[in-house]
Amino acid sequence: MTTAARPTFDPARGGSGRGEKDLSALSKQYSSRDLPGHTKLKYRETGQGTSDENRNRDFRKELEEREREARSGTGATSSSSGKALPSIVRKAIEANNAGGGSSAAKRSKPDAGQQQAQQAAQQQAANMDADEPLDNDSSDSDSDSDDDDAALLAELQKIKQERLQETARRESEKKQEDERIRMENILSGNPLMNYEPGTAASAAGRASGLGGDLKIKRRWDDDVVFKNCARSAPDKKTHFVNDALRSDFHKKFMDKYIK
């Protein structure tokens, strides 16, 4: 007999398993994303543009100094920026600026030999005779190339014209063929025009596959099987008699079952 329906008088109690010494303590489970990430408070530092710093700054004076440095040139700017740099770095920058200025000055003065060569080339170009005839071979080759180009252009234009004419001819032939097919469809598409044999309409109908001896039907149900089945049956004259003994049904019944 099953004991599944019996009440549990002694239920299972926790605390006897592993890690279940304190029954009052609830189990906890944390995710790595739930752990605190910022455990230190961040403070404002100098140079971040706080309200106290902006209150103590003299923006007018700073603007005037920047304008004065811009008007004075790069020297004042480099000197003002060099105040905040260490002495070694400042000396290196000044030496670099001095070397760059001297090298630029040296580059600005061209060599005497180069100047003489340039002057000689200019003099030779000026002494050249502008009326000196060019090479005959080069002129002949240029004229021949021009003639060849003209011939090629003429041939290309001729080919284009021929292609245009061919396209126009094909389009006209296609239009004529479409018109002929349309007229044939008009003549042979109507069955009322080709039901009589020996006519042009019947010939067109035979050519189109409709047949020249097509018979026109007056109704759609003329060729059904069970149409007018009782047409040949004799007509029965029905008459009404207000007497059950002299009615047709009573007479047939008496003739069939009594006689």
UniProtKB/Swiss-Prot annotation:
Would I find Translocase among this entry's keywords? no
Q: What Pfam families does this protein map onto?
A: Cwf_Cwc_15 (PF04889)
Query: Which segments show compositional bias classed as Basic and acidic residues?
Result: 52-71, 157-182
Which residues fall in a compositionally biased region of kind Low complexity? Answer: 72-82, 114-126
Q: Does the keyword Coiled coil apply?
A: yes
Ranges for region Disordered: 1-182
| BP GO annotations | mRNA cis splicing, via spliceosome; mRNA splicing, via spliceosome
Keyword terms, alphabetized: Coiled coil, mRNA processing, mRNA splicing
For this protein, what is any one GO molecular function term?
RNA binding
Stretches of the chain forming a coiled coil according to its record: 150-182
> Where along the chain is composition biased (Acidic residues)?
129-150
Q: Which GO terms describe its cellular component?
A: catalytic step 2 spliceosome; nucleus; precatalytic spliceosome
- Report the InterPro entries cross-referenced here: Cwf_Cwc_15
Task of the protein: Involved in pre-mRNA splicing.
Q: Which family does it belong to?
A: Belongs to the CWC15 family.
- Put simply, this protein is called Protein CWC15 homolog
